[in-house]
Amino acid sequence: MKVGILFHELGNLGTDSLTNLFAQLLGDLKLDAKSQLKIILTDTFRLSYNLDTALGRLYSSSRDYLLSKDLYSTSIDVLIQQFSVNDLQLDWLFVPEETYGCRFTHKNLRVFQQPKSNPCCEPLTDGPSDFEKYKVSALGGTFDHIHDGHKILLSMAAFITSSRLIVGV
C-alpha cells in the first residue's frame, strides 16, 4: 500500500504532535513491510537548517509510529520541491485542504486537521538563503543500505549543491 501525507506550512510542529498525527491517520490502514509512506511538503525551504530540522522531525516521528506497529522495513520518503507527481500513484492521500487532492493520483482521499505550530519547539530561523550555495559537494561513506539518516544527508547535500554532487559508496 502506498500512502501519501501532505503537509502545508509545516512550521514548528513538534515530534510528539507529529507522532500522534501519524497514529491518527495511519492507525486504521492495513500497512505491512512492503507499504510505502510518502510525506509531501509544500513548503519552500530557503535555509538548510530549517530543512534539516523538518526532515529530522518527520523521519523520527513517522518511524517512531511505524516501529510501534512492528513495521521496521516500511519505506519512508519525504518529498520536497521538485518531484514527479505522476510516479506516486497513491492508495491513500491525506491532505489538510481538499484542493490539494486534485494534484495527485489517488484511490482514496481524506482531509485532516493539521496541528498548529508548537511555540515551545525550536523555531525556524530566518537569514540569507543557502540553497544551492556550493557549486560542487562531495560525500563519502557507505551507502550500501539506504536508511532514514542517509536520506536526510543526501537531501541536505542536494539542497546546498547547485551543479554537481559526488557521492562515494
Residue locations for each model-derived region?
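Nucleotidyltransferase catalytic core that binds NTPs
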Residues: 1-169
